[in-house]
Curated annotation (Swiss-Prot):
Native species: Carica papaya
Compartments (UniProt record): Plastid, Chloroplast thylakoid membrane
Record's protein name: NAD(P)H-quinone oxidoreductase subunit 5, chloroplastic
Any single biological process term in GO: electron transport coupled proton transport
Gene name per UniProt: ndhF
Alphabetic keyword roster: Chloroplast, Membrane, NAD, NADP, Plastid, Plastoquinone, Quinone, Thylakoid, Translocase, Transmembrane, Transmembrane helix, Transport
Length: 746
């Protein structure tokens, strides 16, 4: 067993040869490297598979009772300072390593087909391998300096992949936005690390926790300074895990390729923030104000992410806000001190969300056969619908991922989310009400995405019902460069409808132009008018290379929840996760054995599942297919004609829609206050520098010039005149000097 741990330092570096060799190959042998590009995908998958096997072996050792292992190498040693590098293998490291490698392998397999037609294929795999290396280095780090180094490398790789299609201005802007937003959190993290070193004199986690808690217990350090350092440390995870108020970069990060969206949202960048808070939880526990702040930020993010997802039309942006909300649940659990529940939800959510993102990529891939290579169209749920018969396997896998995220048993996220909801009632009833309400919103917006995508009819074809051809087509080159051509806005999504722009429809029931009395619009859905080529092609199912990782993720979604089921009946113990995390931190169940019987479990789960089903029912009520076979919608029509109450309801719904569609106006606020303020300050500084600073300098020069010119003409260009003026000024100076001395004498 000991020899296994001795080689654990190799874990982060095993995938590293791929980006190194790829870079050298493209530099020295570009043609041969490009011709053998499938080999690089195989090598990336093979090396990451080695890490996965290694990680599983280490996890088995941890479950069977092995203690944590740490090995360090001293880099610089003197009497006052010692800097060490090392690796730490404990349950948290084992969990994260398995998560990164399993999701990473499946995403790499998926990417081999998804990115096969992209000229940046090799560049993509180089970035991905370096991304996995950076994340593995982060989770195996034994000290804060090492964490910060890999933390920045993880961020760098994410920026490269978000802006992968850098010739598209919107992708370049998304990359810059992610970079600037994370700079705020990373600067706080760096200051917090330096502050902790100033207090404790150590970067190593084990020494840091022991010294820090002893100083607090003995009141040997100022509590405000300690709180400030902990707050600055927490700022890093707030930005990296897209927590309020530094969440604004996450939806725009969807401009990167879909496979990287799956990896970022499941097991790498956003998971890094949750990992760091979990790693530093023994430090945060000693500061109650910070623990409350963590839970407060978590519950705000839970609610904000869910409300912002309600009206998104882009399928990937809807899933991005879903990720933001679920990360809020994890942060809430950590703030409550429920360490096990947070990590459990991190695991279950990772596989479910990876499945959903890969499913969305398959949907986008199939839609591109109809609308072309345009994210504006291929990701727009308004133009989808009726995909069930075209992509049945993708539909089934996406449905299972949706049900899991909604918290429907026995799928993975049900077990972890239910545990967080139960713990929230013990922590704060207010937080619990918000968390449970958001569980209903989660079910609503996830089934909204599902119904808009798969139910009904393929809406893009109804735009072409008139049979007219349009030469306008919006395409993206293989590098992602946009090619915009004129757009005809005379088409309507629903066929045979005429739009009267003078009539202003309410939001909940927009003006109904019925065909056979069976057409209605759906809430949280505004319909743009795109002009596309008249074509009768249909979406098609993705190839096996894309479907295989999705089917494997279905298995994880079905069964990974079993590792944390807290049942202990007749000596049968299912709770593998608790064995792995022994001893575990849980401030809410300090005197319990973490096991419940079946009756107590069903009693606790019934409420949360009922809320989820209520959200699903509302989604079905509002978003069932517009082209329904039902001829009588008297119930819906009577609901729509209710006088003053109807107007008030419309105002409420319109407010919610505007709030969600405009991202809670938070981006607008940042644009006006921060971006606009900084630009205004820059312009003011530029004006002051040009007019005042340069004015003084130039004024002195101009004044000296005119004085010199004046003296030149007074002297008449004769040396004797210059000497006379010189003597005259000297006499005046001496006269003033002696006159002042005389005054001082008297």
């Amino acid at each position: 067993m000991e020899h296994i741990y001795q080689y654990s330092w190799m874990i982060p570096f095993i995938p590293l040869p791929v980006p190194i060799l790829l870079g050298m190959g493209l530099l020295l042998f570009p043609t041969a490297t490009k011709n053998l590009r499938r080999m690089w995908a195989f090598l990336s998958i093979f090396l990451l598979s080695i890490v996965m096997i290694f990680s599983i072996d280490l996890s088995i050792q941890q479950i069977t009772g092995s203690s944590a292992y740490q090995y360090v190498w001293s880099w610089t040693i003197n009497n006052e300072f010692s800097f060490e590098f090392g690796n730490l293998i404990d349950p948290l490291t084992s969990i994260m390593s398995i998560l990164i490698t399993t999701v990473g392998i499946l995403v790499l397999i998926y990417s081999d087909s998804y990115m096969s037609h992209d000229q940046g294929y090799l560049r993509f795999f180089a970035y991905m391998s370096f991304f996995n290396t950076s994340m593995l280095g982060l989770v195996t780090s034994s000290n804060l300096i090492q964490v910060y180094i890999f933390w920045e490398l993880v961020g760098m790789c994410s920026y490269l992949l978000i802006g992968f299609w850098f010739t598209r201005p919107i992708a370049a802007n998304a990359c810059q936005k992610a970079f600037v937003t994370n700079r705020v959190g990373d600067f706080g993290l760096l200051l917090g690390i330096l502050g902790l070193y100033w207090i404790t004199g150590s970067f190593e986690f084990q020494d840091l926790f022991e010294i820090f808690n002893n100083l607090i217990y003995n009141n040997q350090v100022h509590f405000l300074f300690v709180t400030l350092c902990a707050f600055l440390l927490f700022a890093g995870p707030v930005a990296k895990s897209a927590q309020f108020p530094l969440h604004v970069w996450l939806p725009d990060a969807m401009e990167g390729p879909t496979p990287i969206s799956a990896l970022i949202h499941a097991a790498t960048m956003v998971a890094a923030g949750i990992f760091l808070v979990a790693r530093l939880l023994p430090l945060f526990i000693g500061i109650p104000y910070i623990m409350y702040l963590i839970s407060l930020i978590g519950i705000i993010t839970v609610l904000l992410g869910a409300t912002l997802a309600l009206a998104q039309k882009d399928i990937k942006r809807g899933l991005a806000y879903s990720t933001m909300s679920q990360l809020g649940y994890m942060m809430l659990a950590l703030g409550m001190g429920s360490y096990r529940a947070a990590l459990f939800h991190l695991i279950t959510h990772a596989y479910s969300k990876a499945l959903l993102f890969l499913g969305s990529g398959s949907i986008i891939h199939s839609m591109e056969a109809v609308v072309g290579y345009s994210p504006v169209k291929s990701q727009n749920m308004v133009l989808m619908g009726g995909l069930t018969k075209h992509v049945p396997i993708t539909k089934t896998t996406f449905l299972l991922g949706t049900l899991s995220l909604c918290g429907i048993p026995p799928l993975a996220c049900f077990w972890s989310k239910d545990e967080i909801l139960n713990d929230s009632w013990l922590y704060s009833p207010i937080f619990a009400v918000i968390a449970c309400s958001t569980a209903g919103l989660t079910a609503f917006y996830m089934f909204r995405i599902y119904l808009l995508t798969f139910d009904g009819h393929l809406n893009i074809h109804f735009q072409n019902y008139s049979g007219k051809k349009s030469s306008s087509f919006y395409s993206i080159s293989i590098w992602g460069k946009e090619e915009a051509k004129p757009i005809n806005r005379n088409f309507c999504l629903v066929p045979l409808l005429t739009m009267n722009n003078n009539e202003r429809a309410t939001f909940f029931w927009k003006k109904a132009y019925q065909i056979g009395s069976n057409v209605r619009n759906r809430t949280f859905l505004s319909i743009p008018h795109f002009a596309v080529k008249t074509t009768f092609s249909y979406p098609h199912e993705s190839d096996n290379t894309i479907l295989f990782p999705m089917l494997i993720l279905v298995l994880f979604t079905l069964f990974v929840g079993a590792i944390g089921i807290p049942f202990n009946q007749e000596g049968i113990d299912f709770d593998i996760l608790s064995k792995l995390l022994t001893p575990s931190i849980n401030l809410l169940h300090q005197n319990s054995n973490d096991f419940v019987d079946w009756y107590e479990f069903f009693k606790n789960a019934t409420f949360s599942v009922s809320i989820a089903f209520f959200g699903i029912f509302i989604a079905f009520f509002l978003y069932k297919p517009a082209y329904s076979s039902l001829q009588n919608l008297n119930l819906l029509n009577s609901f729509a004609k209710r006088g003053p109450k109807r107007i008030l309801w419309d105002k409420i719904i319109n407010f919610i829609y505007d709030w969600s569609y405009n991202r809670g106006y938070i981006d607008t606020f940042y644009t006006i206050s921060l971006t606009g303020g900084i630009r205004g300050l820059a312009e003011l500084t530029h004006f002051f520098d040009r007019r005042v600073i340069d004015g003084i300098t130039n004024g002195v020069g101009i004044t000296s010039f005119f004085i010199g010119e004046g003296i030149k003409y007074v002297g008449g260009s004769r040396i004797s005149s210059y000497l006379l003026l010189y003597l005259f000024y000297v006499l005046i100076f001496l006269f003033i000097y002696y006159f002042l001395n005389l005054l001082n004498f008297f």
